[in-house]
Design a protein with these regions (language model features):
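Residue-level marker of intrinsically disordered, low-complexity segments enriched
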Residues: 28, 41-42, 156, 166, ...
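Short regulatory "switch" loops immediately downstream of catalytic or recognition motifs
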Residues: 77-78, 127-137, 180-187
Length: 245
């Protein structure tokens, strides 16, 4: 990208939209994310109708970022709702982590903390709000159980030297995308994200499990094997997603 000339207004970067062919190729995968999410039948049925009327290249009408997180947790073995409350909206499992932190519930896989309160490790979740735009965990704690538009990403790498945190999330410009968030530290707080593309983060959901290496992502088989970077996906029926959760 060419930087704007001096005094020229900076225009936000716009990610390219998926083509109908790309949307068709990933439709079955996204249907699988929804299948791992309770109470999502109506969403899949509605999308089936859209596909039948407009073709399989029609994009998903409902945001699927929480479904992606739910699918990851299902694949990780967190099938018990007492461990992780898989849901079509992020605020459901955010609230579960807040309650677990407040009550000491040892069954829950995550506990909620404010940004900078605890050290961030791979497997943790970082969350922000848009409606409302929460600026602290306290603000959400006062609205437990109330619907809210939120988004969470999974931490996959913490780079202390470069002061960066890499995260992966779903439905980021209609894709599963990894991004790098700048971070900072001070005498009172460990390394923590500054913001997510200018939007404040309000919650750090800490995974209650043994820590792994902060750079474990670098040694992941999918990154070591260049063949895994090819985007060809197996062709399966997108109208009949299945899951073991």
């Amino acid at each position: 990208r060419t930087p704007p000339a001096r005094n020229e207004p900076r225009r936000p970067f716009v990610y390219p939209r998926l083509s109908p062919e790309q949307s068709a190729r990933v439709a079955s995968s996204i249907a699988g994310y929804w299948a791992a999410t309770p109470d999502s039948d109506w969403i899949v049925q509605g999308q089936n109708s859209a596909w039948q009327n407009k073709g399989i290249g029609e994009r998903w009408h409902n945001a699927w970022s929480a479904a992606f997180i739910s699918w990851v947790m299902c694949e990780s073995g967190l099938g018990d709702p007492a461990q992780f409350r898989r849901a079509i909206a992020h605020h459901s499992y955010i609230d579960q982590a807040i309650v677990a932190s407040d009550t000491g519930d040892e069954r829950a896989a995550y506990r909620a903390y404010g940004i900078g309160e605890q050290r961030i490790q791979p497997g943790d979740l970082l969350c922000r709000g848009s409606r409302p735009a929460y600026r602290s965990l306290t603000e959400r704690r006062s609205q437990l159980g109330v619907g809210a538009r939120t988004h969470c990403d999974i931490v996959v790498k913490v780079d202390e030297a470069q002061e960066q945190i890499s995260v992966i999330g779903g439905n980021v410009r209609a894709t599963v995308r990894m991004k790098v968030i700048p971070a900072t530290r001070d005498d009172e707080h460990p390394l923590h994200p500054v913001a997510d593309n200018g939007r404040p983060l309000f919650a750090h959901l800490q995974l209650q499990a043994e820590e792994i290496e902060a750079d474990a992502l670098d040694h992941a088989p999918s990154l070591q094997d260049k063949a895994c970077l090819v985007t060809n996906l197996p062709a399966i029926d997108p109208l009949k997603p299945s899951t073991d959760c």
